[in-house]
Amino acid sequence: MNFKATSLNRIVTSSVAAVAVVLSPVFAAVAQAETLVGAGASFPAPLYQRYAREVRKTHKNLQVNYTSCGSSCGIRNFVKGTVDFGGSDAAMKDSEIAKVSRGTILVPTAGGAVSVVYNLPGVSNLKLSRQVLPLIFAGRITKWNDARIRRDNPGVNLPNRRITPVVRADGSGTTFIFTNHLSTISGYFKGRVGTSKKPRWPIRGARKGKGNSGVAALVKRTSGGIGYVNYSYARLNRIKSARVQNRSGQFVAPSLKAANLGLSSVKFPANYRVFVGDASRGYPIVGLTWMMIYKKTLH
């Protein structure tokens, strides 16, 4: 089916209803006061906290707790059976699903944008082209006044300062979405880094933060820093976000409207696993997040 919400707010609202339907057998099996435990991606953590509040309205004795520990952590705990549900911004692989004896249901719960955040005092509305962005995170462009960056930012006083990339320390679905985009638009990046939840970054002097919040905090206090976080974390921390060039050649800043345009052409296959490598409209670095639920409960 097509991903045709008019805004990400509608996506969130509809996904609450969708998850409630999928989780209904789990809730029905709860016969007494109980706690359901989830863990995984930090990307959807605020949304899943909202789910918990909605669930509590109709299931008074049920407490739902979600720990933000990264997508790799979410998949790992779900496969081990140490949680009741998991969260990941990278859909589980067939090999991972095969390890779950209780069966797996993947529910795409929301979509969102990955912002490229930076810390350059005096520089606003930074533009990063499809040629430049992959080379920064592949370690090929190392100075802010590189001619290739200056070309897209005429009249901007870019400093002769080393670029300090900030990446995730943990296995991350946000990293998966980001590297999937860079691998799609750059053959060099694909060969050098590739698409991964936890790649081996070939960047000298890169700093690492745990979770979206950790990356946001590091960029905020690192002059010359650049990183990638979920759009909501960029807004929450009031960090400047670059305008990123999409496939149509437009430089677009992340926003709910721009992310929705980027997601508007998504078509879901039967297994709901779909990845947006390079959106032609709106903001180009977008992706989905999934909730992982067991087909068979233990109750």
Spans of features found by a protein language model:
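N-terminal secretory signal peptides that target proteins for export/translocation
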Residues: 1-10
